[in-house]
UniProtKB/Swiss-Prot annotation:
Species for this entry: Dictyostelium discoideum
Gene Ontology BP terms: mitochondrial protein processing; mitochondrial proton-transporting ATP synthase complex assembly
Enzyme class: hydrolase
Protein family membership: Belongs to the peptidase M76 family.
Keywords associated with the record: Hydrolase, Metal-binding, Metalloprotease, Protease
Name of the protein: Mitochondrial inner membrane protease ATP23 homolog
UniProt GO molecular function: metal ion binding; metalloendopeptidase activity
Disulfide bond entries: none
Highest taxon, organism lineage: Eukaryota
Length: 242
């Protein structure tokens, strides 16, 4: 089953339960700006390249989980996420209630060596297939980018407004599993207390710093929207567990 087949099956399932979507207008944005790029944004999150299928060094780090990047591995894990992940399926369901089709998703090489994925209104979600990674990271990247797509659908984000981007980055970090405690510990970002908030803020600032339009105001933009956006888990009632 291809990625597109997985999406089609989900759409058919959701449409059977929500016939009203047929009457909803699906809006297409006429610009192609990268809304957000999911990046490794600190040295503690770097994943070293490997020539082997798996690495076995670093018993207490992410190294032992890392796999050699291939397009097939990317596609298989993206398809698995679409078929099995209830969090992603719920986001898609809620997008369709708003009258938005989920974005197209593809696995392809990315120019940036620290990018895991990105979202643009026209091209959809791109998952980087040339970055050493591991299945859970691919899953989190897919959900992360779909949070951005949901926010674009619901809130009509302005891709040139750094505060808008800061808010969706905070939400994506919270809702995707990026800041799961076990992952943070493996990345050596230790901290028992308030680790979720610290991780979400760090990742949001890092993402904005990689955006040429926002790099000089990244921390200010995140701090300005922090109180509101860090408590915004919609369409969930709280941070979902993975």
């Amino acid at each position: 089953m291809t990625i597109s087949d997985s999406i089609k099956n989900i759409l058919l399932l959701k449409n059977n339960n929500n016939k009203n979507n047929d009457n909803n207008k699906i809006e297409n944005d006429n610009y192609d700006v990268i809304i957000c790029s999911h990046k490794i944004n600190s040295k503690n999150e770097e994943i070293p390249p490997t020539d082997d299928d798996t690495t076995t060094n670093g018993g207490g780090s992410l190294n032992k989980y890392v796999r050699k990047p291939t397009n097939q591995m990317c596609r298989e894990n993206v398809e698995k996420t679409f078929k099995e992940d209830p969090i992603l399926q719920f986001i898609i369901k809620e997008m369709m209630k708003l009258g938005c089709l989920p974005p197209v998703i593809t696995c392809e090489p990315c120019d940036s060596l620290d990018a895991l994925g990105s979202f643009t209104p026209k091209k959809g979600v791109i998952i980087c297939d040339n970055m050493p990674t591991f299945p859970l990271n691919i899953r989190n990247t897919v959900v992360h980018e779909f949070v951005h797509a949901y926010d674009m659908c619901k809130n009509k984000l302005n891709p040139f407004n750094c505060e808008h981007l800061a808010c969706t980055e905070i939400r994506a970090a919270n809702l995707s599993g990026d800041c799961k405690w076990q992952l943070e510990a493996l990345k050596k970002n230790f901290g028992v207390f308030n680790h979720q908030a610290e991780c979400a803020k760090r990742r949001a600032i890092g993402s904005l710093q990689s955006n040429p339009n926002c790099k000089d105001v990244a921390e200010m933009a995140v701090n300005k929207v922090w109180e509101k956006c860090n408590k915004d888990y919609y369409p969930f009632s709280n941070i979902p567990r993975i």
